[in-house]
Structures are given as structure tokens and as C-alpha cells.
């Protein structure tokens, strides 16, 4: 009997995921990913394939590409996807004729061309911001600069990925360390990377590593559920309800009634459990007796005196901050903060100015990239800062309006490692509160993407499998759409609600659906809220599991 051919057995497994080609991020049905997601074939011009994982912004990284079929349009190397606010595409690509192209056009030439059966090695020195190419294990090319490597890509913290562009009738097989025979097309020599991992046809350059989970740095937050969780519960309407099952004592919660028209209630540790405010309304804080929601060691208790125990089904999104607030004097006025630096979350309370602007210390030790803001007294809408919009723009989570831009009245200047600014447009607001996050790779991601209006929508790389995703169109009047992993335990994730309204849950609404991936999410719906053709859309996402340890749904 004949055994299974060795090239059909890859070392990729849940303990050490290798990069592959993304079968859900090709640019058209004419681009086909096959052979264990390592081969790409294009039957039309400009067939595109991306690697599934981002190239880390530190270290040295290596992969190989076998040219199966060639055309005048073959390009391979690394590329970051086009983004709404940038002109052009960030890339370093080798064309089949040996010319090397970057963001601004041709960079130079490799001094050789490639033909079918050639193998091109690609080395990315992230520390130096350089790319190298090797042909059939020969001498390396010149060092090609990566344009603006490590730039703040709104799609995630990892900007560049392996990339192939092919014309009609072209094909290539990649090896990220899984198969040095390229699906039986070469006799394997099984060279290892710098850590003794993988199998490559040619010797791996000194210090270079395979794009696989074992080689990636440990995430700052290995277990996101120690800092953030969604939880479902059923209200009782008659008695206080104990909700347990969290791995931490929460300090901030957004509670949504899934079955009836109802506000989206917010509770936090600084104001206390008897103080409720609704994120979808410009109303003042409401005092609930005996309490609305009281945080416990592994959850919370909701009373009959609040809006979060009306006998219906609920979901609560819960974050851990730092417990009772402590003084912070980093700003121009005193702030009281409850901060969790490990997970990048801070609750900030202060007293507003009567003129001009003030600065507030936030305690994160990194610039916050997203926050909710509201005064206690009501009468003023909630406001949102998002890094993709900048300091002269804002959105409001209590309505569906497009972003206000070109106005510095709210924030005035961008936040720093220590402070954020409360602008001159917010005078005489008395007690104010911020819920602010900074980005923690592998745990939280705040960015933007461009919709395409069809069910083969964009893939957004966050670096983790999401537990919670909130999406909002920047340019158009559209609702804030919320997805989570407890109301959507499988793909398609199409049980949604809107943060800015009082409506109940939309079930099985495929026009708004997304897929949760091991490293991000993909838009499957065609609605304007999440995927308007050409629309600029921001997102906020928190993790169920970092990519290094994730398994997709």
C-alpha cells in the first residue's frame, strides 16, 4: 500500500498556526485559493491574494513563493491594503521581469527575472524597515525600503502582509514554513528558521523566522476574559437578580434589553451602582433606589429599582477598570480615575471649566484612541473621540448623524500619554465623565475600513478573534451596529442591535451580517451601516482570544 504523500501533511495545527493565503480576501471569484490555502490561481487580470496574518513590526520574517505559471502581471512581496485616508497603496513588490515597485512607483531592479519553477524568497526586516528578495537560494537583492513601515494602519496594528498579484492564467504556491516541496513540485530539503521551526526549500537567512504563532511575541493580554466579557441573563421583574460568571469584578457595564424598546443603560464604579445613565439619550444621570446595578466579585446584581431587571432577556458588556477612583494631577485640573493599564481602559471623572479648555489626566501611560464622553447633568449629547477622525472631529452615540469634522471645540488637540483635552465647546458642564481606551495589540483594536457594498465584503484584521464589535459609518446618517459573541455563537453573526436607538434586537438580519475570524472580522452584509460602497466606516473591537491562541468559529 502507498502512504499519504508527505506534502499533503502540513505541520499547521491549533498549537502553532502558520500563515496561509486568505480564501476570504481575494478580490474576485476568478482568484482561487487551494492546496491547503497555499496556492493561488488567477483566471483574470489583477487577481489578488493576501496572507492571513500581519507581519509583526519587530523582528525578521521569511517566506518562499514558487512560480507555478507566469504572466506579465505577476507581482509578489508585501503590501498593506488601500485605506480611505491614504493615497496609493503601501507595498514592496517584485515583478516577474525583476523590477521592484514601491508606493511611489518603480524602486529599481533585482537584476534577474523569474520564470515558472523558480522559487523566490522574501525577507522582511521589520526592525530596519527593509525587504529583500532571493531567487532559487542565490544572493539577495538590494535592500528595499518599506514606505512608512509600522504606520498607524486603521485596519489593525500589523500593517503589511504577504501579497500576490497575478494576471490571467497565472499561479503561485506559497510556503510559510509548512511545505518546502510546494505541493510536490520540488524535492524538499527541510531547512529550519532561526528558532528551528518550519521547513523551507532554501537556507533561511540568519535571524529570520517563519510567520507562525510560535514565533510571534506573547500578547500583553493572554486571556481577554480577565478584563472584558459579554454575559447574557434573564431578568426577573419581581426580585433582585444576581448575575455571575465573569472572571473579574466589573467597573463599567453597558446593558441592553434584547426584547423590548428600552434605553441602553450605563453603569460605572465611580458614580456607583445607583447612578444610571443611558448612552442613547442626552439625559441626566438617574438615581435608582435601592440601586440599579451593583458590581460583585464575578458579575453584578440588578434590582427591581432599575431598568436592567424587567423580566426580559439582556446582554451586558462588562469591562474591568481599576476599582475605586484615585486622584490624578497630570492635567490642568484634578481628575479622578479608575484605570486598568494592562487592558488599556480608564474611567475619568472631573469638573468642567467655565471658560476655555482644560486637560485631564487619564492614567493609561499611552494616548487613548477612543472614548465616550458625557456630562452627569444631561441636556448635552454624548460625544465620541476616535483616532481615525482625529482631534477636530466627533461622533455621537445617541444619534445616527455623520461625523462632525473640522471643528476643535470638543477636543482641541490630540491626547498624549498622560492627558486628554476637554475643549472650549464644553464649558459649564459641571461633573463630566469619560470612558477611554487605548489600543492593546491582541486585545483591542480601533480603526476604519472602506465598504464595497456587496456580500464579499472587506476583511478587517484586528489581531484577535473578536468578542465585541461596534461599527459606525463616518460619512452618512447610519446607526451604530453592535455584534457580540454571546448573542452570535456561530457565523454568520447577524443578531444585532443599535447603540443609538431604543429598539429591541434584530435577529437573523443577514443584510448586516459579519463573520468573526481568528484574527478579525469580515463584512458579509450589504447594508450601508456596515458596508456602504465607498463608505468610510469606523470600528471598535475587543477580543475573545488573541490570534496567537485563537480558533475561528
Predicted regions and their residues:
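Surface-exposed molecular-recognition determinants
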Residues: 1-60, 66-71, 82-553
